[in-house]
């Protein structure tokens, strides 16, 4: 960094005085000048880095992007997880959809109408310990690009898992690159045949996740697992105003 004339002089407001022909100033003003000079030097060093960084673009979190989030809870279930193992959350098979837990907690109607476009799809997992005062963390592993004919194991060994995010909640993006989701009659398909809604509507255009969940505990733990699909939809402007009158 070169010589800067603006760093030569200190700026004092009522902090200096002259006693016995000696120029005095308060120690606080000296410390303030030091901090001010350090800030100027730091800004001068950061400016060239900022100019270079402005030439590049970075991606933001797509979950916080434009659009409206619509959540559909698939099921809630209490499962026992053995130590050093991970249990499959959902295998998306036909027999699993007929269980009582799916029909009890499932949404009665599909909240996305035909005039709304699906921009993105997320698999949301919420984990809760069933016993109080338990000190352990939730672990997780998942696969997206699995073969449709692959039969997933119900229980696997923990091998290099990662910890579930804050609030014991994790979201997985299921979008495939280069595939646009068509506008179809989603509401009628969802209400008529729930199983075909996944096999014929979602999985041809989105990844089918295989998610395993475990704990760091050395004992058998009971965990409440809540699975939901979170749709990011694009809302189109209506053709006519929703309200009429002098105030609108």
From Swiss-Prot:
Keywords: Viral occlusion body. One of its GO terms (cellular component) is viral occlusion body. It comes from the Viruses. InterPro entries: Polyhedrin. GO terms for molecular function: structural molecule activity. Belongs to the polyhedrin family. Component of the virus occlusion bodies, which are large proteinaceous structures, that protect the virus from the outside environment for extended periods until they are ingested by insect larvae. This is Granulin.
């Amino acid at each position: 960094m070169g010589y800067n004339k603006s760093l030569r002089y200190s700026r004092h407001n009522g902090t200096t005085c002259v006693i016995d022909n000696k120029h005095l100033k308060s120690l606080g003003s000296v410390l303030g000048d030091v901090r001010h000079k350090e800030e100027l030097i730091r800004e001068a060093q950061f400016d060239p880095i900022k100019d270079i960084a402005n030439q590049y673009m970075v991606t933001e979190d797509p979950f916080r992007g434009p659009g409206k989030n619509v959540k559909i809870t698939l099921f809630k279930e209490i499962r026992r997880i053995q130590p050093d193992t991970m249990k499959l959350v959902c295998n998306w098979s036909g027999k699993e959809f007929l269980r009582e837990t799916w029909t009890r907690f499932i949404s009665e109607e599909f909240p996305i109408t035909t005039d709304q476009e699906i921009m993105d799809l997320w698999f949301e997992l919420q984990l809760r310990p069933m016993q109080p005062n338990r000190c352990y963390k939730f672990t997780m592993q998942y696969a997206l690009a699995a073969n449709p004919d692959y039969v997933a194991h119900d229980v696997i060994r923990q091998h290099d898992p990662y910890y579930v995010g804050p609030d014991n909640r994790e979201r997985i993006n299921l979008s495939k690159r280069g595939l646009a989701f068509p506008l179809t009659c989603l509401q009628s398909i969802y209400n008529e045949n729930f199983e075909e809604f996944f096999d014929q509507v979602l999985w041809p255009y989105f990844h089918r996740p295989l998610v395993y969940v475990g704990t760091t505990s050395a004992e058998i733990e009971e965990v409440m697992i809540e699975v939901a699909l979170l749709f990011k939809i694009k809302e189109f402007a209506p053709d006519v105003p929703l309200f009429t009158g002098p105030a609108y």
